[in-house]
Regions:
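Interfacial segments of alpha-helical transmembrane regions
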Residues: 49-54, 141-160
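Hydrophobic alpha-helical transmembrane segments of multi-pass membrane proteins
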Residues: 19, 23, 114-125, 191-199
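Internal alpha-helical transmembrane segments
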Residues: 2-68
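Transmembrane alpha-helix/helix-exit interface in multi-pass inner-membrane proteins
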Residues: 161-175, 199-201
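Alpha-helical transmembrane segments of multi-pass integral membrane proteins
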Residues: 180-216
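Alpha-helical transmembrane segments of multi-pass membrane proteins
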Residues: 30-35, 125-128, 195-206
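Long hydrophobic alpha-helical segments that form multi-pass transmembrane helix bundles
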Residues: 54-132
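Structural signal for the C-terminal ends of transmembrane alpha-helices
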Residues: 39-45, 132-143, 208-216
Length: 216
């Protein structure tokens, strides 16, 4: 009951945040995924493991689908011009528009963001399930027993995931400053970020696990 109330509160805050402050709100997606995970409470470890395997397959399929969609869009002659025009219009509204115009645009963008939940929702579900797995296997509760694992995760994050995240940041900033430029590279970086982002987050967790181990 407490967890359900917290999810409802998170959903309410996410909806307000997405419509009034930032259309890229992630709290709503977290809440919706949390309700899905709540239905799996009490499952046995074999059932959870099957859910993890299924969610991995779904995410692999979605990643391939996104790659095909991006390749198709970026090869369209007028796609770059349309994308640049949309970015310039959004920038004009956010900097010169009144409160009503900005709010309307933000609500429209938030609705479009939520419509993509079927694409990024499974990724969040997989991360949640990996958290459950990490607790069940003792990776989080007994990190001292899994030093080698956390060190490998940290090394992968620093030497692989971090450079890829920096590359995405560079491409995203370049495209934001010059939206009329070719968007192929930023879309490629965004696709890579689907894997590099969670990998870097896992490296952050590894830092806490290894540091906390030394403190205790």
């Amino acid at each position: 009951a407490i967890y359900r109330r917290r999810l409802k509160w998170l959903l309410a805050v996410g909806l307000l945040h997405g419509t009034l402050l930032w259309f890229g709100d992630i709290l709503t997606a977290y809440a919706l995924t949390g309700f899905w995970l709540l239905r799996r409470a009490g499952e046995s470890w074999p059932e959870i493991r099957q859910s993890v395997k299924f969610t991995v397959l779904v995410n692999v399929g979605l990643l391939l689908l996104m790659a095909i969609i991006m390749a198709t869009l970026t090869n369209m002659e007028d796609y770059g011009a349309e994308t640049a025009a949309e970015a310039l219009l959004a920038n004009d509204i956010s900097t010169n528009g009144g409160w009503t115009e900005v709010t309307k645009a933000r609500i429209d963008d938030f609705g479009a963001n939520l419509s993509g939940f079927l694409l990024f929702g499974p990724r969040i579900a997989l991360l949640f399930l990996l958290g459950v797995t990490a607790v069940h296997l003792g990776w989080l509760t007994h990190p001292e027993r899994h030093r080698a694992l956390w060190r490998r995760i940290l090394l992968a994050g620093v030497f692989v995931a971090l450079p890829l995240n920096v590359w995405w940041g560079y491409e995203a900033l370049s495209w934001a400053l010059e939206p009329e430029m070719d968007s192929r590279s930023v879309h490629m970086a965004s696709l890579v970020l689907e894997l590099a982002g969670p990998a870097l987050a896992a490296a952050y967790v590894a830092v806490f696990m290894l540091t906390g181990e030394r403190i205790t």
